Each structure stands twice: as structure tokens, then as C-alpha cells.
Amino acid sequence: MTLLMCLLMSLLIFVRGCDSQFVDMSPASNTSECLESQVDAAAFSKLMWPYPIDPSKVDGIIYPLGRTYSNITLAYTGLFPLQGDLGSQYLYSVSHAVGHDGDPTKAYISNYSLLVNDFDNGFVVRIGAAANSTGTIVISPSVNTKIKKAYPAFILGSSLTNTSAGQPLYANYSLTIIPDGCGTVLHAFYCILKPRTVNRCPSGTGYVSYFIYETVHNDCQSTINRNASLNSFKSFFDLVNCTFFNSWDITADETKEWFGITQDTQGVHLYSSRKGDLYGGNMFRFATLPVYEGIKYYTVIPRSFRSKANKREAWAAFYVYKLHQLTYLLDFSVDGYIRRAIDCGHDDLSQLHCSYTSFEVDTGVYSVSSYEASATGTFIEQPNATECDFSPMLTGVAPQVYNFKRLVFSNCNYNLTKLLSLFAVDEFSCNGISPDSIARGCYSTLTVDYFAYPLSMKSYIRPGSAGNIPLYNYKQSFANPTCRVMASVLANVTITKPHAYGYISKCSRLTGANQDVETPLYINPGEYSICRDFSPGGFSEDGQVFKRTLTQFEGGGLLIGVGTRVPMTDNLQMSFIISVQYGTGTDSVCPMLDLGDSLTITNRLGKCVDYSLYGVTGRGVFQNCTAVGVKQQRFVYDSFDNLVGYYSDDGNYYCVRPCVSVPVSVIYDKSTNLHATLFGSVACEHVTTMMSQFSRLTQSNLRRRDSNIPLQTAVGCVIGLSNNSLVVSDCKLPLGQSLCAVPPVSTFRSYSASQFQLAVLNYTSPIVVTPINSSGFTAAIPTNFSFSVTQEYIETSIQKVTVDCKQYVCNGFTRCEKLLVEYGQFCSKINQALHGANLRQDESVYSLYSNIKTTSTQTLEYGLNGDFNLTLLQVPQIGGSSSSYRSAIEDLLFDKVTIADPGYMQGYDDCMKQGPQSARDLICAQYVSGYKVLPPLYDPNMEAAYTSSLLGSIAGAGWTAGLSSFAAIPFAQSMFYRLNGVGITQQVLSENQKLIANKFNQALGAMQTGFTTSNLAFSKVQDAVNANAQALSKLASELSNTFGAISSSISDILARLDTVEQDAQIDRLINGRLISLNAFVSQQLVRSETAARSAQLASDKVNECVKSQSKRNGFCGSGTHIVSFVVNAPNGFYFFHVGYVPTNYTNVTAAYGLCNNNNPPLCIAPIDGYFITNQTTTYSVDTEWYYTGSSFYKPEPITQANSRYVSSDVKFDKLENNLPPPLLENSTDVDFKDELEEFFKNVTSHGPNFAEISKINTTLLDLSDEMAMLQEVVKQLNDSYIDLKELGNYTYYNKWPWYVWLGFIAGLVALLLCVFFLLCCTGCGTSCLGKMKCKNCCDSYEEYDVEKIHVH
């Protein structure tokens, strides 16, 4: 029962008392002391190689868990590193060693064990970034060697303690991750780390730092010690009550990789890029460790490689990057890996890509996020608090710079104004915070370092200085916001002056046999120098030298210091370093400010201010209004828990409204990849270079902006735009209000090549256009006129509007936003619809200006032209000389070697077959280019013959007076001929190499041109195909859209109804507001379409009224049109139509034609007028007919000038020359498809968001030019055929010696005999050829009669 309870509890939390659940980590270390080490943090920090996070290279990305994607781009919210984050660099080094080939001694490490980092959301590690390159060794910077990859080691825990010397150690259970086995094993264990008490160990004397190490020449040889680092760690800590111990094997290589650690309720997760993406940055989870206690801190374990002095190697730095909850845009390849990424909150351009879920964005003006107006002041009402006590720094003797004093404050209110009033401030500079902010903010702690310091030396203490002050005396830390105050002490301050200013000008350690090796001892930020104890109060003389022998705990050697004395000034001059640390605790340090008019809101009514009202903080606009609510409660809230009213200490009641937020748009030009930022309808005085900008679509806050020069325009504040008074008539990036953004590559560029330019969009009238005559028809003809000017405004665009849907519906409440997620992509569709309306505006305005600027178009060419001979792509057949080959049996029975044959090997082989090979070698020599040549190979027979000849000539030389030396001539000739053969072969190879190089270069040039051309051609195909595929994919994805339901699956809806019911009230509110928002968007879409239609009308009026004289009555103003003028107006055009308007008319009797009585009759018709009767005569057969124009009554005789002959009974139609004959021929290049497009582009349908189908591209491709060029390139490739000189392969066979054949035959005979005896001489009844009987070895069996079976 006890065991059962123990197991049950272990599922919830590690039970410390269940011994059966612990892992045996024995053996424990039995070393009498820990290994000696030298901590030299300054040397390690000098070597810095920054590697910022680059999402485009997929740096540090953890692959989404439990799912995979293919060939898709999506925005994903998870744990990612910040783009551009430099991270923290860590470096390992080899240890000290004795002599050139001596064994290693003490370790050489940095102070990583003293650095405790916050774990937060976890981190990722870049490993081996510089592996395989050449670099320096930390311990010997002058030595360059190849860099190897080093794996990091970590301790992760939730609680800390300290050693007796104040150094941090991990308490309770800690997770330890250690690489081992010389980079082939990774250990992870969860234990209580109990410090050992022997010498140099954490609880012993002489402790400096814990670390792990491997002795390379012992642990990393043929047999790898898989526990070398683990055992070294055990020498510092006893591993107590370990709950698990896991190990993973690692393939040893020098490939760069990524490693990551996160934690959630399931435990600690480990990630690595080695699992599935070795040559990329994708990290996959490979282990989950049962660690459920929240990890708060981590420390990098120092590591030392104990190598001999002559075998030292450099080790690559690794980089740790913190993870944050961010939204990334991820691009998944076809094989499922992430190959591109964008940090959505990095800058405006990143938000643009993420807002539209695309890595490729076309040129345009896009809405990306919202921006809340910056506060213009502060309103504070708060209770009184206890003041921080600064009196210790105002009494006693002022300390020297190297012996500075420090005050740390918490849980009090400080009065910085009062403190600074006691000094004559000479300089007040800050880093990471402004002087005003540090005096007005609240912090978890406030630290003040102060010391006596002359103002004449203030340049030596500034950031970036490298003099003696920051090296040996005081180095300011910039880890937290900090300020530096340089001031003179006033006479009424009681602080005592020292005799003189003093500082350390040298602090070094002397080591070596003769103490001739000097190592400067630099200080780290916030640390004291080891030389400060020589003279804490100051130096008695300038250049005073001090020496002291260092203890073994201090690292040994001789400490030497030099002090410099500076004369004291009349008034004591001091330096104050104020550092603050932000936090969320209740023991905060807040300012006791001289609030001035911050206590009153009367001068800031109607403005956006930051307020702090008795602990309630926020940002809003205060207004006087009628009091509501209970006065004693001070605060009045609405049903959304928003502060809407406040009873102030001044007795007034103020309404509180939220500050105005404005839309943010990005102006983007694809050709230059430049962008600018537009803050709609806001003054630049409210916009800073890094404001609180938040995109609810990408859930990202902006962190960076490149440009910091705002420009005020009529449409809002723009950053990244310069004003050069440009006027353009064509605009691809309209901003509204007749403003345009011109990219820097434009012909209008005159100022900056790195910014957009602001231009005014203006219409310039053409010079002269000949009017087109036309006729009109009326029953009354004017007799008098007056001039009239008709003014007309046509709206061609509307103000672009974006709505933050989530903010409008939920007003920032998390519970509401979670329910709103159940409505699918409703909000995103709202934003898409509004963005579509904005794009429609841009298109209509661009079309308008293009139409009134030019009327010429260029026709498209359709189809593919030309024939393509694909056989040109075939590789030509290259033939060679025929070669004879031995049979398969011969290949089996002979040893062989294949060598290059320049052409003489076959003749040599045929000659050798005619007699004994050992005697015919020289006889069979071949001639090539006048040289005798032999193959560069000997068989055993020739080796024996030539060796015997050579030895015989040498041995007999003494007996024959050297005459026997002639026997060595065959050997010499053989060597000469064979060397000739080698030379001839090399010469042929060299010539062929030149031919190959020349032809290959020619082929490369042709291929380069060909691939470039094919890339241009196929990119057109890809654009067309991808555009259709993306549109169809978008259309198919709509099938899974919930369209406001909680799920697209009916079963899910039925299963989850009970969970929705509890949020019914909030759901009703969401429904009501979404309906209101939907109605607004619908109205906006109608207005947008109306403006687009009006833009077409404006285009027609420019072409007909401004460029020409219109004969249409009333189209270009009132009356008969004379001339029109047009000027720009907000969101449209303003027309001035000049015409004459009839004031009096006369009624006349008119006829459309006159005919006589001839047979056939002869008829005439008026030209641009009427035939009328004379009004002064009486109607009779003698009635006189006259002609008058249709626009002005002026009778005149009928002549050939104002009439024409026509045939009777035939209708006369006058066709204007600007109208094509209908249905005759398509002479205007406008076909039925174009007419449909002209119709449908002005028709908008809002069904279930199938608008994306309009983006399907049906463009016909014209690839004939590109394919023709490819034909020529392929011909050039075939021309690069390399006609090599014949250099075949020759296979030389070497027969086996006689004893091999003899053994081979004997084996065959033995095999045959074995078979014979097994088959013929075994078994009962055999006689072995009648020579042997075996009756005695056979048992007797009864014989049975067996019935015969007949098979028919």
C-alpha cells in the first residue's frame, strides 16, 4: 500500500522520500580535491563575433508541434527569438599546460558559473557557427588553428543559494544537461546538487568555480570515455536523489546546428535541428523530460578541454537567444520544412508581409496596424509616502573612484529633485532611459554608486572610453537603465573632502618562474578592483607602487598596483551613477516628485494624457461633464470595466474617454523594396519614431523603425517620405487628397535615393484638340443667348477607412476576444473587404489618370510561334575504338588492373603473346612520336628476370672489371621506355584537359545564357500557374470556413453546445456589434463602388468637355458647350464648364427635307439645321423656304453649302467618325471577352467571400522569343562536343604462378573423390566397385510383400 501511494504521488510531484523512484548515479567522486582553475572573464569577453537572428535563414525556429505543412505560407504564433537579437555569446577554451608536450594543468575558464539568467519562455542555442574555419585560442590569442564545434552545458533550476563567499549555487532539484564522450553523448539528469566540501570544491576552501572538463589525450582516443565530463562534474557536486538520467548518442561532425529548451505543463522539452533538418534551422522535439517544477533560472556551465600544449585546438563560440511569444510568418516548402520566415513585429515592412500572409507583396499602400496617439501630459493624484534616505552619501569622507560606495533602495519614495539641488550639476546623461523618465518612474530597486571624481576627467568615465578608469577603477554597467551625474558639492553640504583625488593606473598579476609574465587585471561592470585594498582612502604620492603576494585562492602570483594622485579642487567634485531595475513587486521605489501642474487636469482637458490616480493608471482624455455615480467611490466604470469618470481632489467630476487611435498604413514599392509609414489623420507631434504600435491581425507590437524624420501631410503623418514640391500626372501610390508617393527610382527623383518623395497629383490640360461637329434636334430655335459658367464637382475617391474589428467589438477584453475566435475569420474578412475597397480606389484613380493622359493601347500577341526541335537537346553519341574483353571465367581466374591507354597497349599485348613474356618485354617496345614506350607495369616473371640481371651485374662487377655491368642495360632500357610511356600518357592527358577546359567554358557560357532565358520564360509560366493555383487553393479553403459557426463540422457543433451556452450573454453582444460593423462595411463598399463609377464619369468629361467641344446638350454644363476647365479637388475633380444658354426662342415650322414634283422626285436635306418657312409670309403654294442652323435662329437662302441631295424614300443616317460600325468587324481590338470584362469589373457581388476567384489569371503567354533563344543556346551546347584524342582503357591480366594452379587442381581432385565415396561407398548393400562388402554393418529386416498398384 505504501508503494502504491508513493507511485500515485510521484505522478503529481517528485516524492523525495521514495527511494525506489530514484536513479542510481554511483559511483560518487572520491577525489581528494577539485581541479584547479583560472577564471579570466576579461579574456573571454574580448573575443566577440556577433551572430544576430536572421529569420530569412530560419535561425532558431522550433517547428510547430504535432503537425506539418507543405507548400504553404501562414502566420504562426509561438515561441520564437527576436529578429536581429544578438543573444549572449559563450566561449570555451583549452586549459593550461606545462611545456611543449607536457600534460595539461589547471583549467582556463570564464565566470559563467557566476552568471544566473532568467529562463522565462526558454531559449535556443546556435552551435558551431564558426566550425571548420580558422580562429584563435582564447588562452593563446596569437595562435591560429582550426575551430571545432563545442556543445554547451547547462544547469536549470527554480531556486538559488550562495556559497560562503557569496557565489550563486542552485538549491533543491536542478536539471543538468552535459555533453560528454568528446561530443558524442548528451546527458540529462534531475538531481539535488550537493556541493562537495574538499579543497577547491563549492563548499571547500579555495573554491573559484565549478566546471566540466575532458582530458583529450586520454578520453578522446580510440576508446572514448562516455562519462568523462559527467565524472568531472561529480568532483564538484554529489548527485543526490536523482529522479531520472537520460543519454542520447550524437554523431560526431562539425556541422552547425541548433538546440532549444522550453517548458510547459507536460515537462521540459528538448529540441534539435539534427533530428530532421541537419542542414537547416528547423528544430524538432526529440525528448520531453519529467520536470514539472517551474524553471526560473539557468546557468551555462564552464567547460575546459585539457589538451597538451602542442595539440591545442580552438573551439567555436555558441550563442544563447531568449524565446518570446511572437507571431512569425512561415514559408513551408514542398518537403514540409520551413525555408523562410519573418518576425511580424520587427518593423513596418514585416507587419505588411504578415498582415497579408505573403513574402511577395506588390507595390501599393496597405493598412497594417493601429496606433494610439501619444500622451501629451501627465495627471497624477497619489497619497503621501516615506522618503528614501540619501543621507549616507552626504556625510563622512567621499570615497575614491576605485573604492566607490553603493546604496540600494527599495520600498520608499525618492526625491531626485531635492538630491540634485544640493549639487551644482555639470552633466546629467543617461543610457536606456531619459533623465526626465528616471525621475518619474517606479522601479523594483534603485542603486546609487558615488565617489569623488574630478570633472576634468569626466571624459574617461563616459561610455566607450578605454582609459585606466574603466579598466582598473570603475566600469559602469549598462545591463539596466542607468544615468551618470557629474556635479560639484555645494558649500552647505557636510561631506568631507579627501586630501586628493586618486585612481589606480595599473593593476597586474606577475607570474612565471622569474615573475616576468604580466597579466593586467581588468574589472567587470560594477566590480571592485583587487588592487583597491592597497590604499582605500587615497594615495600619498603620484605614481605610488604597491606589491602583494597573492594567495592560492586568489590565483597565485605577485600583485602589483600603481596609484595616481590628482590635486583636490576648491569644491569637492563627485560622480553619481544611478541604476534602476524594473519589476512588478509591491516593494517599489517611486519618485517623490515635484509634480507641478501634474496635480491638475484643467490645462489638459480634451487632450490625451497619462494618468495615475491613486494606483489606477492608464491613458485617456479628460472632460468636464455632469457628475454621475457615488462621489465617495471616486471612480465610475462602465459595464466593460472601463474607467469613464473620476471625482478629483479638486472637487470636480471628469469624464474619461480613451485616446484616439489612428490607422497605420505602409507605402511599399516592390522594385526598390522600400517602404514608408503613414499615420492617418494624426499630427506628427503625436507620433514618435518608436510608438506603441500594435497589429491585432498579426498580434505583434512593432519594435523597430529605420527612419526617424516625420513629414506632416494633408492625409496624416508620414515617416520615410521627403517633400520636394514635385507635381506628377501619373501615380501608382496615391495617398489621397491629391497626394502621391513617388519611389526613388522615378524620373522625378531630385533629392534622396533612399526615400519616397511626396508629390502633388495634378492634371495638365492638353494644348489643342480639334472639335468634332455634330448636329442637334429641337422644335424651338434660340434667338438670344447669355454666357454661363457651370461648376461641377465629381468625387473620384473616398477616404480610406480601416476598422480594428476586435477592438471595436470587444474593447480589449480577453474573454470576449476568445469568444470572437469562434466566429472564424469574420474580423479578417471585414479588414479584407475594406482593404479591397481601398485597392479599388487606387485602381480607379490610376485608371482615371491613365485614361485622361493617353488613349493608345498596345495589343497582345496570342499563342506560341515557331517549331522546336527537341532532338537538339539530346546528347550526341561519342564512339571509341572497339576493345576485346576476356570471358567471365577468365576475369574470375586472373588478377587484373586497368590503366590509361594512349594507343600502344594493344600492340604491346599482341607482341607479348607470341613468346615467353619475360624474354619479349624489350622486343615488344612500341613507338609513339619517335619514342620507344613500354607499359608502366611489371608482372612477377619480369620482376624476377630484371632483378636477377641487375643483381648479377652488380655481384660480378668486381670479378669482371666492370664488364658484367652490361647485364644491367636491359633493366635500364626497361625503365627508360616505361618512363617514356608515362610521359606520353601525361602529355595526351594534358592536351585533352586543355580541350575539355575550353569546351567546358564555352558550354558554361551557353548554359548560363540559356538558363537565364529559360528562367525568364518559365517565370511567366510559374506566375500564371501559381496565380491560378493560389486562387483555387483560396477558393477550396473557404469550404472549411465556419462563416460564424463554432465549427465546420456538425458533430463538433453538437458536442460543444454546452460550452457555448455559458457565454451566451457575451455572444449576444458580439452578434449585435458585428451586425452594426457589417452594415458599416457594406455602406463603405457601396460608396467605394460609387466613387469608382464617378471616376469613370470624370474621365469621360475630361475627354469630351476639356479636350474637345461637346455637342451633347447639358453634358458639359448648361446650354451649348464652349470650353471646360478642370482643377484638382479633395478626393476628386472640380470642373468649370463655360457655355451659352438660350434666353429667348422662336417657334418655327421645320422640315427634315424638301422634294420637288419630278418623277422620280429630287430631294434635298439640310446640313446641321432645318428647312423653315418664312415667318412673315402667309402659307400658300408660294411659301418660301429658308435654311437656319439648329443652335441659332438665322434664316438664309438654301444653297449647296447648307444642304445635300438625297434619294426619296431612303432614311439618311449620319455616322460620327468616332463610333465604330456596329457588328461589322473588330477593327478596334475590342472583342467579346473585353466587353464582358468591362461589364463585370463594375459589378460587385458579396456572397460568402468568393471574391478571390477574380484573381485567377487567364493571361495568354507569349514565349516564342524565349524559346527561339533556347534553340540557339542548345545548338551552342551541342557545338561544345569535345573531340578527345583516343585515350582508351587497357586491362592487364597477370597469370597465377604454377603452385597456385597445382593447388587449384589438387583441390578439384579431392572434391571429386569426396563426392565419389559419399555416393558410392556408403549405405547398406554397396560394394564399392565390388571390392568391399558391408553385410556386417547392415541390420536385417523382414521382407514384406507389397501389393502392386496399377495406375491407369
From Swiss-Prot:
Residues 1022-1066, 1259-1287 form a coiled coil. Residues 1247-1286 are annotated as: Heptad repeat 2. Glycans are attached at residues 30, 71, 111, 132, 162, 172, 227, 241, 384, 415, 492, 624, 723, 762, 773, 784, 869, 1144, 1147, 1174, 1226, 1242, 1257, 1278, 1289. Keywords: Coiled coil, Disulfide bond, Fusion of virus membrane with host endosomal membrane, Fusion of virus membrane with host membrane, Glycoprotein, Host cell membrane, Host membrane, Host-virus interaction, Lipoprotein, Membrane, Palmitate, Signal, Transmembrane, Transmembrane helix, Viral attachment to host cell, Viral envelope protein, Viral penetration into host cytoplasm, Virion, Virulence, Virus entry into host cell. Residues 21-356 form the BetaCoV S1-NTD domain. SUPFAM superfamilies: Coronavirus S2 glycoprotein (SSF111474), SARS receptor-binding domain-like (SSF143587). PROSITE patterns: BCOV_S1_CTD, BCOV_S1_NTD, COV_S2_HR1, COV_S2_HR2. This is Spike glycoprotein. It comes from Bat coronavirus HKU4 (BtCoV). The lineage of its organism: Viruses, Riboviria, Orthornavirae, Pisuviricota, Pisoniviricetes.
